[in-house]
Amino acid sequence: MKVNKEEYRGDYGEISLQPESLDDLWHLKYIVEPGDTVFAMTFRAVDSVSDKIRPDKVEKKLVRLGIKVESTEFHKFSNRLRIKGTIISDLDAGAYHTLNIEPYSELSIAKHWKSDQIERIRDAVEASKRPEVEIVTIEEGEAAIGYLRQYGIEEVSRIRQASSGKREGADARSVDGRGEFFGEVAAQLKYADKVQTIVVAGPGFIKDDFVKFLRVNHPAVAQKVIVEDTSSIGSSGFQEVLRRGAIQRVAEENRITREAQLIEALLSEIAKDGKATYGFAETKRAVDYGAVETLLIADETLRGLREKGARDIESLMRDVEHARGKVVVFSTEFEPGQRLEKLGGVASILRFPIGGD
């Protein structure tokens, strides 16, 4: 994310941004909300003399347009954020229009800013400077490759070894015996030239043999590899990599690693009826006691409450910050955020237990 300009009067201000990736569009989904004013370049139909002669032909020109936001939609697979609202100026004021924001589009957002939204922009700017990571989880005959994004791990490829011509014994366990399979896996490392780190993980010794294969056949890629033990591959293997801290060793401030560790700490405290709360009412009680060390909120829960105009959540976050606690907004596109949402979307890790009523 790139910030081009910021202007504030109190908590109201306008920020000019340039998203640079799919991750940045995902962040904007939770920054732009109903009632905001957004300006961006867009195509609009314009009247001309030729239109009157040939009414079936509509000319469109690129113009800068401002809309009052009603809704947003994040389209991961088409690489865009759609912002729908009513035009605030021009001859078509009041008409509906949708702004399609893509990577490297520029937009300006004018609104009453909340502290977590400003922090989210700062995080996105910092995240663009961090190393990106590709993860290979591999076992006998099968591998899954994932790309670490700020909103979670996206599985980009799965490779299965052909069942025909299977080898047995020592030959099956040799690097040569797996050469074709390893070659297919290496060919699917689509981001190898882009990322700074590749985590190779899985059960047994096959991951080590795959790294040996890379050293011989793809030495530049092998230089980026770190190896991690996991008991499985695919989604559960990706989560093991995160829990074991492999990603944290690469980028200690990575959002996903932090959320995975926080949710584990929360669930551990809940299991022993210790220093934790979940659900809005119980968490608010802990905030009133000044007991909250870290407030955990699912992004979809926060977004939904704000769209309904609920102010309790804003005061809850503000009270935690005033008491020198931390507020962490979780991504619900990633497993820890989904688990938090199942607990009501709001929870806390406490400085001290508060007990029951």
UniProtKB/Swiss-Prot annotation:
Disulfide bonds: none annotated. It is found in: Cytoplasm. Its EC number is 3.1.-.-. Its cofactor is a divalent metal cation. Keywords: Cytoplasm, Endonuclease, Hydrolase, Metal-binding, Nuclease. GO terms for molecular function: endonuclease activity; metal ion binding. InterPro entries: eFR1_2_sf, eRF1_1_Pelota, eRF1_2, eRF1_3, Pelota/DOM34_N, Pelota_arc, Ribosomal_eL30-like_sf, Transl-rel_pelota. Its main location: cytoplasm. Monomer. Belongs to the eukaryotic release factor 1 family. Pelota subfamily. The N-terminal domain has the RNA-binding Sm fold. It harbors the endoribonuclease activity. May function in recognizing stalled ribosomes, interact with stem-loop structures in stalled mRNA molecules, and effect endonucleolytic cleavage of the mRNA. May play a role in the release non-functional ribosomes and degradation of damaged mRNAs. Has endoribonuclease activity. This is Protein pelota homolog. The gene is pelA.
